[in-house]
Amino acid sequence: MSILIEAKKEVKQMFKRVFLVVLDSVGVGEAPDAEKYGDSGANTLLHTIGDAYNLDVLEKLGLLTLVGKEEKNTRGIYMRAKPINLAKDTLNGHYEMMGIVQKVPYKTYPNGFPLELISKIQHATGREVIGNIAASGTQIIEELGEMHMKTGALIIYTSADSVLQIAAHEEVIPVEELYKICETVRKITAGEEYKIARIIARPFIGRPGSFTRTPKRHDYALDPPLNVLDLLDKNGIETIAIGKISDIFNNKSIAVKIKTKDNIDGMMKLIDFAKGEFKGLLFANLNDFDMLYGHRRDRVGYLRALEEFNYYLPILLKNLKKDDLLIITADHGNDPTYKGTDHTREYTPILMYSPIFKKGKRLQDRETFADIGATILDNFNIPNELHLGNSIFDEFKK
C-alpha cells in the first residue's frame, strides 16, 4: 500500500477522479441486526450465484471472497460495510454513504395511505384513486391497469419503503402530466404529517395481460440534509450523477445529471465518461438488479444481470487512468431467493480499484456505509464536517 501513501503526501488529492458505482441491492450477507428486520439468513450475492457463474472480473476485485468463495489473485481492495441507518431502502442506503443517518426514519404505510391523504390527492389532481395498498409494481398494473385505462384513475401503491408510487398508462395520462401530478403530491406530503421519503412516477405501456413499465420513472425526493455532495460542491469539486442518483438527492449539489434506460446503458455512459476528461466524483446507480430481479425474486435474471455487468466491467477498467479510483458498492440487499418481495438487511460490498494498485487485499469490515463518503472527502483533502465515517485510506497505513 506504500504507493498510495506516497502519492497522498505529494499531491493535494490522491485521485483526480472517483467513480462510485452502486450495484443496487447487491448485498453480501445478513447484517448483525438482520433478525430485527425479519431478514435472518439473507445473502443476496451468495444465493444468487450458487456454484455456477461467470464473474471472473468481479472475482479478481474480491467481491466473491466476501461471501466465502476462494480468493483468486485479487487486484482490488475489498471489504464489507455494515448499515447503521434505520431502514433498508435505496434512499437511506445512499444517504448513509454520503454521511447522513436520520434519527427519526421516514414513515411507511404497509396498510395503505390514510384516507384523508387520498382525498387530498383526488381533490388536488381531479382524478380518482384506485389501489392504495402495498404491492409489487408489476402485479398492481396487471390487476388494475385495465380499470385505470377505462376510468383514468390514478393507481397509487406503496411498498415496505417510505414511498408513494403513482402508476399511469402513457396513453391515458401522458408522462409530463404524470410528472406534474407527482410534483403536486410531493408538495402535499412534504411535511411532518405524512413524512414520505419519495413520490415515484411509474409510467407503463401495453394492453391488458401485457403491460410493461417504461424507463421514464421519476423520483421526487426531499432535499437531503448536509452531506458529502454539498461539501464537495462547496470546495469546487463537481459531482456527475448517473441513473437515479439525482432523484435520490433531489438534484442538490449535482453539476451534471444523466438518466439511464438500464444497466447496460448506465455502463456505456460510465465508460464514455472514463474515456473523457473531468475532475471530481462520478456517482452512478445501476438499478436493474433490484427493480427487475430482486423484488420479483428472479434468481436467474439477477445472475444474468451480474454477468452482464461483469462483461462490461473490463472495458471500464481499461479506460481508467492512474489517478482514477473506482469504488463499487451497494445500498442494501434484495435476496431473490428470500421470502416476500422486499429488500433485505445486509452488509454491502466495498470494492476499490485503481491501475496503481499492485495487489489485492481484504480489509476489516467497516462500521458504516459513511466510510465511503469520508474516503471521498479525504481524497479531495476536504475536512469531514459531518463527523460520520472514517476514511478507508487510513487502513492503507497499517
Residue locations for each model-derived region?
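Feature captures the catalytic ectodomains and active-site-proximal regions of enzymes
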Residues: 2-398
